[in-house]
Curated annotation (Swiss-Prot):
Species: Photorhabdus laumondii subsp. laumondii (strain DSM 15139 / CIP 105565 / TT01) (Photorhabdus luminescens subsp. laumondii)
Pathway: Amino-acid biosynthesis; L-serine biosynthesis; L-serine from 3-phospho-D-glycerate: step 2/3; Cofactor biosynthesis; pyridoxine 5'-phosphate biosynthesis; pyridoxine 5'-phosphate from D-erythrose 4-phosphate: step 3/5
UniProt: L-glutamate binding residues: 9, 42
Residues the record lists as N6-(pyridoxal phosphate)lysine modifications: 198
Keywords associated with the record: Amino-acid biosynthesis, Aminotransferase, Cytoplasm, Pyridoxal phosphate, Pyridoxine biosynthesis, Serine biosynthesis, Transferase
Listed EC numbers: 2.6.1.52
Function: Catalyzes the reversible conversion of 3-phosphohydroxypyruvate to phosphoserine and of 3-hydroxy-2-oxo-4-phosphonooxybutanoate to phosphohydroxythreonine.
UniProt name for this protein: Phosphoserine aminotransferase
Positions contributing to pyridoxal 5'-phosphate binding: 76-77, 102, 153, 174, 197, 239-240
Record PANTHER family: PHOSPHOSERINE AMINOTRANSFERASE
Family: Belongs to the class-V pyridoxal-phosphate-dependent aminotransferase family. SerC subfamily.
Pfam families membership: Aminotran_5 (PF00266)
Amino acid sequence: MNQVYNFSSGPAMLPVEVLRRAEQELCNWHGIGTSIMEISHRGKEFIAVAKEAENDLRDLLSVPENYKVLFCHGGARGQFAAIPMNLLGDKVKADYIDGGYWAACAVKEAKKYCTPNVINIKTEINGLKSVKPMREWSLSDDAAYVHYCPNETIDGIAIHEQPDFSDNKIIIADYSSSILSGPLDVSRYGMIYAGAQKNIGPAGITLVIVREDLLGKARKETPSIFDYAVLAENDSMFNTPPTFAWYLSGLVFKWLKEQGGVQEMAKRNRAKAELLYDVIDKSDFYRNQVAPENRSLMNVPFQMVDASLDSKFLAEADAQGLQALKGHRVSGGMRASIYNAMSIEGVQALVDFMADFERRNG
């Protein structure tokens, strides 16, 4: 079988080393005669797995001691509801930064629980999609928190700035598609959350990193399974957690540390993205519609000037082992998601195919 490279936006590819280790351990984990999927989440074996995963994540992101790390159910969409239920307190309004599709989804859910002050930061630079810099965000004085999404997967738009607002601003960020892709100053945020299925592990588990002083403020009607204080008190095991996803995420954390950590990931991810954007920018056949300063390093959408060739491109790419390149239904075209597990060799294979396709069809 030819080498396959999976450019899916999520669930995304996992490091092959992680998959091989999971395969080796699947039926007989650490010699106990059963699978990790079959053991009790309250047994000493799994508790050790869970704690090790948390410790490795804390090391990777240098998570301060006054932050809780939670492994939750419900995905990022679950957090769209959990955030206002937990963090609104006695206020009625929260600032929501609208930079794209997923930010808008968060707003839609938040409207059930609070009054979102929607701050539209979408703009254009020389006809290319962009977002306003943080210094131009018109934040409210009376908002409970500020919510934003640093990386919009569909349009491939990224906010590369780290927040630097006044100390009384509680910043909440949806890092689902860019967590662990580079260094991150957790202390600048009140809370960070991320669905696992892009840069952490398989679908089914959600990471929440929340500052301790924000716990215990949930509305009384908040379901216990979404109450951060309840989850923290029970070490994310208020009910049976998604144990296999937790275990696999822990293997990914170990792999990241073995590779050199998030600093090394940042170098690799920039190199991969530059390789792909360079081919697009030098071509009259392909185009990317995002301003260079806001281009995502994780999700690279591109279109062909002749959109009638899209189906042919996708079919031929798939036949060569370049999978899941179809763009989101909202934006069309193509999209290459190049998360941590994607190798530079995979991106090189894609750009080689793109150059060949242009020669034959341009």
